[in-house]
């Protein structure tokens, strides 16, 4: 990063995104371990960084699963009434990003629009984040596992390049939630909407060499595992 701009970004917004990512991974593991039909969380408690959950028709003791996983993901868990199903939490992460860090990345998208130099934002699972300057028309791919990331794009609307597909894959393989490509007028969010299977991961790795975004969406469980939508 010699002579390149870089900044540690650690605030309530990076912490909020990381918390939601950890909650999702926690719920996925509990759901699988206890073999529940579904699992809900309380949306009000979630805003206070607490997990109040209600598991539906579990084959095994859900409390044992909670004990196993809550320390691993550093979440406070209580039993109660839930109104937000796990399947909607993935969208919740994108919406939270849109209300928070999205505006900041738009400012850097303008810089990229003028100079062509791209900027990358990474959010770690511990709530810390970083913002780094890359090269012209080239995104930087740090090796540190991240739960969410975004980078700026010089063209509008943003069309994922081979490097962009690689960035998305890196996030998903590390059990992150998604990646946003930020352009001046529109932004493309690419994210998972359920746990990825081993077959999904194998498909992602094979498509990384091709760099085909359309094929990545289509071939990953017929589009069910990964979703893309524009945010403004």
Where are these regions (language model features)?
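Short N-terminal edge-element motif at the start of the domain
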Residues: 89-114, 125-126, 131, 138, ...
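Short, compositionally biased leader-like segments
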Residues: 71-96
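Active-site-proximal loop/helix of nucleotide/amide-processing enzymes and allied scaffolds
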Residues: 1-80, 134-232
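Short beta-strand scaffold segments in enzyme catalytic cores
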Residues: 117-125, 180-184
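N-terminal start-of-chain detector that recognizes signal peptides
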Residues: 90-96, 120-121, 150-155
């Amino acid at each position: 990063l010699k002579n390149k701009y870089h900044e540690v970004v650690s605030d309530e917004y990076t912490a909020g995104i990381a918390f939601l990512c950890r909650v999702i991974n926690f719920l996925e593991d509990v759901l699988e371990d206890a073999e529940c039909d579904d699992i809900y969380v309380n949306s009000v408690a979630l805003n206070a960084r607490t997990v109040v959950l209600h598991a539906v028709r579990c084959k095994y003791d859900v409390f044992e699963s909670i004990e196993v996983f809550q320390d691993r993901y550093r979440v406070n868990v209580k039993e109660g009434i839930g109104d937000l199903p796990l399947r909607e939490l993935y969208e919740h992460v994108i919406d939270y990003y849109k209300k928070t860090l999205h505006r900041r990345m738009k400012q850097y998208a303008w810089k990229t629009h003028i100079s062509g130099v791209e900027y990358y934002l990474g959010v770690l699972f511990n709530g810390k984040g970083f913002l780094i300057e890359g090269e012209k028309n080239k995104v930087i791919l740090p090796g540190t596992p991240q739960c969410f990331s975004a980078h700026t794009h010089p063209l509008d609307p943003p069309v994922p390049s081979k490097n962009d597909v690689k960035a998305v894959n890196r996030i998903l393989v590390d059990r992150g939630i998604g990646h946003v490509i930020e352009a001046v007028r529109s932004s493309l969010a690419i994210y998972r909407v359920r746990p990825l299977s081993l077959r999904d991961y194998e498909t992602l790795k094979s498509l990384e060499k091709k760099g085909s975004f359309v094929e990545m969406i289509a071939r990953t469980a017929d589009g069910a595992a990964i979703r893309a939508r524009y945010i403004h």
